[in-house]
Each structure stands twice: as C-alpha cells, then as structure tokens.
C-alpha cells in the first residue's frame, strides 16, 4: 500500500488569490511571498509529524555523482530519477510496496523534519540546501530493514541515490511503533529493537566515537553477560543488520526524545 506524500495545496491556492490581498490589506509582494513560504513550511512540518506518528521507519537518501555527471547539472531531472529509484526498488523486492509506505514527491525540507526529531544535521543552516529524498514505511521485521539498507541506485546512472539515514520508531505510544502489541511480528520487532539499543549503549566508548570497524566489532561481540546466541534467529538478524549498517558507513547512531517521539537513528558518518 503505497502513497506519494505532499502537503496540502489549499493554503497555497488561497495565498495566490486576490482575496488574500484584500483580507490582509496592502501587503508587498515580498511580504506575501514570505508569509506563503512560512505557511508552506508549517504545512510540511505538520505533514512530517503526521507521518512520524503513522509509520515506524523513515529512510533518507541523498545524491552522489557516479563519475558521469554532476548533481548541479540542470539536465538531470531529479524528481524523475527519484521516481525511477522507487520503481527499481519495488521491482527488485528491496522496497516492499505491500507494506504501508509513503514516498515524498518533493525533496525534503530539511529543517522541518530536523525540528520534528531534534536532528542537528538537518537543522544546521549550512545543510539547508542539501537535497535529501525521504520515504516512510511500516516495516514488520529486521529483514525488511536490511533490504532497505542494502538497496542503492544502480552504478550506471549519472547521479544516484544512496542511503544516508534510517530511523526506527521505539516509542511505546506510537500506534505503529516497532514496539507494540500487534502479534508475532510486532513481538519480533520489539525483541530486535530492545536488543539493538542496549547493545550500542553498553559499548559506550564505541558509541561516542563510532566508525566502520567499531560497529562491526559491536555486531560480532560475544563477550556479554548474555552472550549473543548464534542460534537465535532475531539476534542473528540484528548482528547482520549492524554489519550492513557498517558496510554502508551508517555509523553515527543516536536516540532522539523530542516531542513525544523516540527514535533510534543511524546516520552516515561524514568523511
């Protein structure tokens, strides 16, 4: 069940009509533009908040050159490449379109999502123009997360999308949280998430300055009070997930507690 998210255009339509000018008096074009921009920003922030309440996972992708072109080249239609990326992911089974999913048509409004989750890398003014593409999904198990992590654009395209951030909802209050009371799959996810977070936190020295090799070490570490049981399917899946994150350089973990939303977030470390 897939939808393509966008904020409501009703307010935008109103702002374009003469009634707006009549209602608010003699305002300049600059003032009208500023107000329109502010309202659109609030609409997007509200929409992101709605999706964070509704879905238990979000994924951010950003663009990288593959040696054949530049992102700033105006000949590339990035919305079309984003749509092709989604189609390719679904056709290859990396994106399960049978799960509740929403793909944001437009590029991410970075600071809006950053304010929703308290993510500094999105609210930093220097990052305001960095282009991310975003999808929200309600995943049901660790293998679904692994599929999302492993899927990137094919290398033969001029500019391609690459995984940058993955967020997992661990908020007990969220109706679609990975920790809920919705059956066997929810129980599996609850066990998986409840294992990932302490595993990172117990490795506190690594947690503060994580990198590729340290995350792999955490994933492989068996010297715990409760050893990682290789025969336990879910724990084995968690080990594989952490290894996949490390392979993709997604080695900056954090836990947000902002506005009632608790998310375990992994972000690609800057080189």
UniProtKB/Swiss-Prot annotation:
<dbReference type="GO" id="GO:0006364">
    <property type="term" value="P:rRNA processing"/>
</dbReference>
<keyword id="KW-0507">mRNA processing</keyword>
<dbReference type="GO" id="GO:0005739">
    <property type="term" value="C:mitochondrion"/>
</dbReference>
<keyword id="KW-0698">rRNA processing</keyword>
<dbReference type="GO" id="GO:0048255">
    <property type="term" value="P:mRNA stabilization"/>
</dbReference>
<dbReference type="GO" id="GO:0017004">
    <property type="term" value="P:cytochrome complex assembly"/>
</dbReference>
<comment type="function">
    <text>Involved in 5'-end processing of mitochondrial COB, 15S rRNA, and RPM1 transcript. May also have a role in 3'-end processing of the COB pre-mRNA.</text>
</comment>
<dbReference type="GO" id="GO:0006397">
    <property type="term" value="P:mRNA processing"/>
</dbReference>
<keyword id="KW-0690">Ribosome biogenesis</keyword>
<keyword id="KW-0496">Mitochondrion</keyword>
<protein>
    <recommendedName>
        <fullName>Cytochrome b termination protein 1</fullName>
    </recommendedName>
</protein>
